[in-house]
Amino acid sequence: MQTRNTFSWIREEITRSISVSLMIYIITWASISSAYPIFAQQNYENPREATGRIVCANCHLANKPVDIEVPQTVLPDTVFEAVVKIPYDMQLKQVLANGKKGALNVGAVLILPEGFELAPPDRISPEMKEKIGNLSFQNYRPNKKNILVIGPVPGQKYSEITFPILAPDPATNKDVHFLKYPIYVGGNRGRGQIYPDGSKSNNTVYNATAGGIISKILRKEKGGYEITIVDASNERQVIDIIPRGLELLVSEGESIKLDQPLTSNPNVGGFGQGDAEIVLQDPLRVQGLLFFLGSVVLAQIFLVLKKKQFEKVQLSEMNF
């Protein structure tokens, strides 16, 4: 009987621990993942629109810089680095989903030419692995190995993200050719302002949905506000809900206009996109170029030697 009670107690403790862990995970994930690459994966078949705009800009409304560094040329079946830089002021804090202030996270999407893909672990050098750190990249879609996403990850540690890329080999992939190819990148720091369903996050400005007099501002128990606006012309009441974490710019009794900001803008992040070009070089072409350059150098040497020989002959004839 005692043994049965012991097993029952252990089972209850395990169940409680799992439940608590799941709750912590859900709360943590909800607070950091707003409008990161996973939203693009869920809602867009291709992250780059026909206009060239990367869809992350639909949720991250502020425009911020991003940069990418890749080699000018690569040889087939070789691994190279694509370094994405997402600069921002490390002292900045953002509003989290729970209304508190926290550090910024970053995310990126890298759109490679067809045939280029994430390098397998056994092809990555120790030096490159050290630059990559603990990052875990994933394909945008199982059938789109040339589109890679990462994030959210801590911005203070990964404001520069190194992607290990494997160049294709036209000898084994007939759809790939020795050409110059474009590479596109999008990078964000901080949370987005709009969710994919069109609703606002608490990381943006909230405007008045009606004009009139603010008759009441109610501070909610779990954070945030309810602002009651009364239209003086018809006494109609409108209640605007302000989520937690935002700073009000208005007060009771104040007269406001339609679309007037009720809060300050908390957003300190933003999204940017860029591009680069890379040449998939034919090794035979490189060998041919080296042979040509070698021939030119040899020709120059022979000309110099011939000139010196001619000068010696002229000098000997003059002495004779």
UniProtKB/Swiss-Prot annotation:
This is Cytochrome f. The lineage of its organism: Eukaryota, Viridiplantae, Streptophyta, Embryophyta, Tracheophyta. Heme binds at residues 36, 56, 59-60. Belongs to the cytochrome f family. It is found in: Plastid, Chloroplast thylakoid membrane. Keywords: Chloroplast, Electron transport, Heme, Iron, Membrane, Metal-binding, Photosynthesis, Plastid, Signal, Thylakoid, Transmembrane, Transmembrane helix, Transport. One of its GO terms (cellular component) is chloroplast thylakoid membrane. Its cofactor is heme. The 4 large subunits of the cytochrome b6-f complex are cytochrome b6, subunit IV (17 kDa polypeptide, petD), cytochrome f and the Rieske protein, while the 4 small subunits are PetG, PetL, PetM and PetN. The complex functions as a dimer. One of its GO terms (biological process) is photosynthesis. One of its GO terms (molecular function) is iron ion binding. The keyword S-adenosyl-L-methionine does not apply. Its main location: plastid. Pfam families: Apocytochr_F_C, Apocytochr_F_N. SUPFAM superfamilies: Cytochrome f subunit of the cytochrome b6f complex, transmembrane anchor (SSF103431), Cytochrome f, large domain (SSF49441), Rudiment single hybrid motif (SSF51246). Component of the cytochrome b6-f complex, which mediates electron transfer between photosystem II (PSII) and photosystem I (PSI), cyclic electron flow around PSI, and state transitions. HAMAP family: Cytb6_f_cytF.
